[in-house]
């Protein structure tokens, strides 16, 4: 039989965990000093006053290389536990890991062929 009172702890936890961030934002908004001036409106460049416009545009190529790096970095994070327990796991897990490695490699070869990784 479904008893609703068994979930009292869950609802209490949900309400308390929702109220803590709300209270933190409200308290910081009340206690934070409000001071706006030219120092607050200028960008901070390693203690040096910026010359010219502080908003520079980056080439999209930097983001493409960063994205490829993040994909392979995350793949390494997922492959590490598999490598540590390689001797316990069977052949089927090895095939799954091989497929897991081949998918980003195929994607990288495709991006390379399309010219997404070319610098010029």
From Swiss-Prot:
GO biological processes: photosynthesis, light reaction
Single Gene Ontology MF annotation: NADH dehydrogenase (ubiquinone) activity
Transmembrane segments: 9-29, 64-84, 88-108
Keyword Transmembrane: yes
Membrane topology: Multi-pass membrane protein
GO CC entries: chloroplast thylakoid membrane; NADH dehydrogenase complex
Reactions the enzyme catalyzes: a plastoquinone + NADH + (n+1) H(+)(in) = a plastoquinol + NAD(+) + n H(+)(out); a plastoquinone + NADPH + (n+1) H(+)(in) = a plastoquinol + NADP(+) + n H(+)(out)
EC number: 7.1.1.-
Record's function text: NDH shuttles electrons from NAD(P)H:plastoquinone, via FMN and iron-sulfur (Fe-S) centers, to quinones in the photosynthetic chain and possibly in a chloroplast respiratory chain. The immediate electron acceptor for the enzyme in this species is believed to be plastoquinone. Couples the redox reaction to proton translocation, and thus conserves the redox energy in a proton gradient.
Family: Belongs to the complex I subunit 3 family.
Protein name: NAD(P)H-quinone oxidoreductase subunit 3, chloroplastic
Upper lineage: Eukaryota, Viridiplantae, Streptophyta, Embryophyta, Tracheophyta
